[in-house]
């Protein structure tokens, strides 16, 4: 069925997609970016973000405007959901007004509650468990650089957080080796690793280590994120000495494949998880990666709204 099977569905986690559906989404994103396809709609996207956002908010907004639709910013601080209205009530009401809803929240279970009580598609715009929209853009960027995904090795260095979770799942579904290098006690959730082993395409696998240099050796992509996620700001300073060996710098990058690229989902703490020299260097693809958030999310909305 491919892309058409996504019409009316939700995307709460990256593994909500089949391997075929993910490949179709990535191709659709490429076609939208190149202008091969120019769908048009008069749909309304709602953004309900309980956490701060730059790239996700702006890229979703720009994507819907480019499609000819409208966007409502449903800030919890000025809507009743921020004053305690139950999620199920908010979901039922919004379902009568808008066509698709992107939610950035803390609990994955909140996303499921929205999905259970609304007929419109619900998109996970980041939760504490996963960040599927980010990984769609990451995979699009990697494919643009290498012309393929299968057989590549991507190394994630740092905290085993929501981005790491979605990268593990999305990467193995595309037949990639996903190496994750974290300090001890900061590994990705065991259930995510187990799930990845169950859904991996041929050639896809997860490798966990606490050795950043071994993880970087020969890798095609080095990827990092902040060492303390949103809501963990009080832990940031104490984590710096723990995570310092996992910084992507010129020394670590030299261990990777000579044609390796560097990714970061942003925002970055320059000089902590990644150096200025690497961010601004010739192997950095951070700005292409950020741009592709718009194209990947446009493809996702086009598919979920049944516009193709």
Curated annotation (Swiss-Prot):
EC code: 2.1.3.3
Keyword vocabulary terms for this entry: Amino-acid biosynthesis, Arginine biosynthesis, Cytoplasm, Transferase
Amino-acid biosynthesis in keyword set: yes
One of the GO biological process terms: citrulline biosynthetic process
Binding, L-ornithine: 162, 225, 229-230
PROSITE patterns associated with the record: CARBAMOYLTRANSFERASE (PS00097)
Subcellular location: Cytoplasm
Gene Ontology terms for molecular function: amino acid binding; ornithine carbamoyltransferase activity
Catalytic activity: carbamoyl phosphate + L-ornithine = L-citrulline + phosphate + H(+)
Pathways involved: Amino-acid biosynthesis; L-arginine biosynthesis; L-arginine from L-ornithine and carbamoyl phosphate: step 1/3
Annotated binding of carbamoyl phosphate, by residue: 53-56, 80, 104, 131-134, 265-266, 293
InterPro entries in the cross-refs: Asp/Orn_carbamoyltranf_P-bd (IPR006132), Asp/Orn_carbamoylTrfase (IPR006130), Asp/Orn_carbamoylTrfase_sf (IPR036901), Asp_carbamoyltransf_Asp/Orn-bd (IPR006131), Orn/put_carbamltrans (IPR002292), OTCase_ArgI (IPR024904)
One Gene Ontology cellular component annotation held by this UniProt entry: cytoplasm
Sequence similarity: Belongs to the aspartate/ornithine carbamoyltransferase superfamily. OTCase family.
HAMAP family from the UniProt entry: OTCase
NCBIfam families xrefs: orni_carb_tr, PRK00779.1
Function: Reversibly catalyzes the transfer of the carbamoyl group from carbamoyl phosphate (CP) to the N(epsilon) atom of ornithine (ORN) to produce L-citrulline.
Protein name: Ornithine carbamoyltransferase
Organism of provenance: Synechocystis sp. (strain ATCC 27184 / PCC 6803 / Kazusa)
Gene: argF
């Amino acid at each position: 069925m491919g892309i058409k099977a996504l019409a009316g569905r939700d995307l709460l986690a990256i593994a909500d997609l089949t391997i075929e559906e993910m490949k179709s989404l990535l191709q659709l994103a490429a076609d939208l970016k190149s202008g091969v396809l120019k769908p048009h709609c008069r749909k309304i996207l709602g953004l309900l973000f309980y956490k701060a956002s730059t790239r996700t908010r702006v890229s979703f907004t720009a994507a819907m405007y480019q499609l000819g639709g409208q966007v409502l910013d449903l800030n919890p601080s000025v809507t009743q959901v921020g004053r305690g209205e139950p999620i199920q009530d908010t979901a039922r009401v919004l379902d009568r007004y808008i066509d698709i809803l992107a939610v950035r929240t803390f609990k994955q279970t909140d996303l499921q509650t929205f999905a259970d009580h609304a007929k419109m598609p619900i998109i996970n715009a980041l939760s504490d468990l996963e960040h599927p929209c980010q990984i769609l853009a990451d995979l699009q960027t990697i494919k643009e650089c290498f012309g393929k995904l299968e057989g590549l090795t991507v190394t994630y260095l740092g905290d085993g957080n929501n981005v790491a979770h979605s990268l593990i799942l999305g990467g193995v579904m595309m037949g990639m080796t996903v190496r994750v290098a974290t300090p001890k006690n900061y590994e990705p959730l065991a259930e995510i690793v187990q799930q990845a082993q169950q859904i991996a395409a041929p050639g896809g696998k997860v490798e966990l280590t606490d050795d950043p240099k071994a993880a970087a050796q020969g890798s095609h992509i080095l990827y990092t994120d902040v060492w303390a996620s949103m809501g963990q700001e009080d832990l940031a300073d104490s984590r710096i000495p723990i995570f310092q060996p996992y910084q992507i710098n010129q020394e670590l990058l030299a261990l990777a494949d000579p044609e390796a690229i560097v990714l970061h989902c942003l925002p970055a703490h320059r000089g902590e998880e990644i150096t200025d020299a690497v961010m601004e260097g010739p192997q950095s693809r951070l700005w292409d990666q950020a741009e592709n958030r718009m194209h990947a999310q446009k493809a996702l909305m086009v598919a979920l709204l049944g516009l193709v």
